[in-house]
């Protein structure tokens, strides 16, 4: 997968290219992240990249010419048909379904805004899609872009150490993940659930699915509203709910 990034702070993306899962993906040639800074496309000695908004008001906007030239340079590098994405609080909210859709693109260009944003005409002429990390404001698009890169890279074959890992992530099936445990068997007086020590893979699978359903019901019940549960899932969720209510009553 090739990802181009337009950012005033390209050095921030070393967190993606040099570390962790994405860093290994870059090292192994599975992920290529290339950055362009609008500052490199300025023509004044101050390398100006911001400009006043028409109509006045607080704050500045990213200057059109350097940003547009950087986008064009990235497009020329990427080739025809490459999707250009602007990270914006006004965009479609990113969820696992959206990540899966974006991961189907072998190439994409991410535009990271700064200041009060970018000229609306640039959005109309240069941007294909706008995506948001959520209903809150960041100082710039870089952190959002890094989160997007990290999430889509998990879908690249060979990036994860275990191919089943991405399929078992939270939200991969529309559900939150189940609880996980490692050594020691007893921690702060709490024991690892005995089923996980049993070696019975069918029961372990059933327990994990039940816990995943139950955790989603407790913490993100709205996710269940959009799911068509199988008979097994419905049965396990009912079991979890009954057991949970008994525990609450006993407490």
Curated annotation (Swiss-Prot):
GO molecular function: tRNA (guanine(37)-N1)-methyltransferase activity
Pfam families in UniProt: tRNA_m1G_MT
Residues the entry annotates as binding S-adenosyl-L-methionine: 113, 133-138
CDD domains, A to Z: TrmD-like
Enzyme Commission code(s) on record: 2.1.1.228
Reactions mediated catalytically: guanosine(37) in tRNA + S-adenosyl-L-methionine = N(1)-methylguanosine(37) in tRNA + S-adenosyl-L-homocysteine + H(+)
GO BP field: tRNA N1-guanine methylation
Annotated Gene3D superfamilies: 3.40.1280.10, tRNA(m1g37)methyltransferase, domain 2 (1.10.1270.20)
Family annotation (PANTHER family): TRNA (GUANINE-N(1)-)-METHYLTRANSFERASE
Family per record: Belongs to the RNA methyltransferase TrmD family.
Function summary: Specifically methylates guanosine-37 in various tRNAs.
Protein name: tRNA (guanine-N(1)-)-methyltransferase
Gene that produces this protein: trmD
